[in-house]
């Protein structure tokens, strides 16, 4: 085993890396958000998934205001080290639209189909 260092990840020109959140047990993809090296470190230290909000230019602890927290179970690095997978225990909906997942729209035969309503 090797000690993990967030600085070894491959960030984009803005110092960000995409992170996909996946529900523990089911494997359901919940959402994608951005992290920087500090939010990766905070996530690992606290066990609460912490993203970087590009619009607010601030840390975003998932569920801090909504109560829809993501408890980190496992953090995985892809083969190119330029994308993360956070396996989480999600409390409540993951999406800010109050849906279980952010990927609730399907494109089928050129048409958009909404797969789920808000909870």
Curated annotation (Swiss-Prot):
GO molecular-function terms, A-Z: magnesium ion binding; phosphoribosyl-AMP cyclohydrolase activity; zinc ion binding
Location relative to the cell: Cytoplasm
UniProt keyword Hydrolase, yes or no: yes
InterPro entries: PRA-CH, PRib_AMP_CycHydrolase_dom, PRib_AMP_CycHydrolase_sf
Cofactor binding description: Binds 1 Mg(2+) ion per subunit.
One GO BP: L-histidine biosynthetic process
Co-factor requirement: Mg(2+); Zn(2+)
Sequence positions that bind Mg(2+): 78, 80, 82
Cited SUPFAM superfamilies: HisI-like
Pathway(s): Amino-acid biosynthesis; L-histidine biosynthesis; L-histidine from 5-phospho-alpha-D-ribose 1-diphosphate: step 3/9
Primary site of residence: cytoplasm
Gene3D superfamilies in alphabetical order: Phosphoribosyl-AMP cyclohydrolase (3.10.20.810)
Residues annotated to bind Zn(2+): 79, 95, 102
Pfam families, alphabetized: PRA-CH
Enzyme kind, highest EC tier: hydrolase
HAMAP family, alphabetized: HisI
Function comment: Catalyzes the hydrolysis of the adenine ring of phosphoribosyl-AMP.
Similarity comment: family membership: Belongs to the PRA-CH family.
Protein name: Phosphoribosyl-AMP cyclohydrolase
Organism annotation: Jannaschia sp. (strain CCS1)
């Amino acid at each position: 085993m090797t000690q993990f260092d967030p600085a070894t990840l491959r960030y984009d020109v803005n110092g960000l890396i995409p992170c996909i959140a996946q529900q523990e047990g089911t494997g359901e993809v919940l959402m994608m958000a951005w992290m920087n090296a500090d939010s990766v470190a905070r996530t690992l230290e606290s066990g609460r998934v912490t993203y970087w909000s590009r619009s607010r230019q601030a840390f975003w602890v998932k569920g801090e205001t909504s109560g829809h927290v993501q408890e980190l179970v496992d953090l995985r690095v892809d083969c190119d080290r330029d994308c993360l997978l956070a396996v989480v225990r999600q409390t409540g909906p993951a999406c800010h639209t109050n849906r279980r997942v952010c990927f609730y729209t399907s494109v089928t035969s050129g048409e958009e189909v909404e797969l789920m309503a808000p909870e």
